[in-house]
Amino acid sequence: MLRPKIRVLIVDDSASVRQILTTILNADPDIEVMASAADPFAAARRLQDEIPDVIILDIEMPRMDGITFLRKIMAQRPIPVIICSTLTEERSDVMFEAFEAGAFDIVPKPRIDTTHALLEASARMCDAVKAAARARIRPRRPPRMVVEAKLTADAIMPPPVSGRARPTTERLVCIGVSTGGTEALRDVLECLPAKAPAILIVQHMPQGFTAAFAKRLDSLCEIEVREAQDGDVVVQGCAYIAPGGRHMLLQRTGQRYHIAIKDGPPVSRHRPSADVLFRSAAQYAGPNALGIIMTGMGDDGARGLLEMHKLGATTRAQDEESCVVFGMPKEAIALGGVDKVVPLAQIPREIMLWQDAKQPVPTV
């Protein structure tokens, strides 16, 4: 029995973009474009007659912007929405606003200047649509009230240097996450105390956005969150997010862990790649590492987590029920590299239980 095609509604004020996206999607045998609209009002009229499986939405449009329309969709009838806009490439705040409003994924507008770029964009868009059609779309959480911080003398001058450096860590956590990860990471990191172990994170995100993403998380969390830089010494109570477009590896010199940022080709179709991070953690931390694979499409991280598992690391995977896309965890479980499958809400507790229970193992 043939599976029904994934039905897509395209909302973009550019006729040429609508045509390019329609051509790309209709070329995939599993997808069909049911309709297109030049603005949110035309799209809303179409939605009264027919509900698509996935919506592809621009941001800058006449009469109503895409973010406002996205919020209305999520409030009335949640549908997986993929943002396709050049604005998200230029302004990181717009990207985070889209995710917070309920966007499933953000995909750059297709480039047609070269055949390679068009093929790459086509594959990325079709993959995103297929993942969105399988996704679990949940009602959005109300935004948190932000209380203005009480300032100290640090606002005027830095505190005196005590001569005592922050402790390095013998144990650390490595996390690989993709689609749905921006909100999932917030859920995890917000719950961790300042004494949490060091955490190295690969979140699939475009180049230029990870610094702003880290800064946003840092403002919400007790632990420090920063974009990783080459040579960073890994310390307790700090989370390091791999910079977009580059690989992050764990290395060790004597008793100190530090971070290496490397260029190179995409691994498992991604750069940064969770497989690269996990392999380096297996080599340099072994049983002193906790590897966690979370929501995301594809299989990045599955093989690397298995390597960590084989070299004595503790491993966890996010469960299907709490994943936006149960792709990366599913592949890791299938390979046999996962010790325990847990819901998203339990991951912070798993991290702290592991830190409190497991003694560091001497490593060479």
Swiss-Prot record:
Biological-process GO terms, alphabetical: chemotaxis
Residue positions where 4-aspartylphosphate is found in the record: D58
EC number assigned by the record: 3.1.1.61, 3.5.1.44
Enzyme active site: S178, H204, D300
UniProt xrefs under CDD domains: CheB_Rec, REC_CheB-like
MF terms (GO), sorted A to Z: phosphorelay response regulator activity; protein-glutamate methylesterase activity; protein-glutamine glutaminase activity
UniProtKB keywords: Chemotaxis, Cytoplasm, Hydrolase, Phosphoprotein
Catalytic activity, reaction form: [protein]-L-glutamate 5-O-methyl ester + H2O = L-glutamyl-[protein] + methanol + H(+); L-glutaminyl-[protein] + H2O = L-glutamyl-[protein] + NH4(+)
InterPro entries, sorted: CheB-like, CheB_C, CheY-like_superfamily, Sig_transdc_resp-reg_Me-estase, Sig_transdc_resp-reg_receiver
Transmembrane segments: none
CheB-type methylesterase domain boundaries: 167-358
One annotated Gene Ontology cellular component of this protein: cytoplasm
Post-translational modification: Phosphorylated by CheA. Phosphorylation of the N-terminal regulatory domain activates the methylesterase activity.
Function of the protein: Involved in chemotaxis. Part of a chemotaxis signal transduction system that modulates chemotaxis in response to various stimuli. Catalyzes the demethylation of specific methylglutamate residues introduced into the chemoreceptors (methyl-accepting chemotaxis proteins or MCP) by CheR. Also mediates the irreversible deamidation of specific glutamine residues to glutamic acid.
Comment block on domains: Contains a C-terminal catalytic domain, and an N-terminal region which modulates catalytic activity.
Name of protein: Protein-glutamate methylesterase/protein-glutamine glutaminase 3
Organism, scientific name: Rhodopseudomonas palustris (strain BisB18)
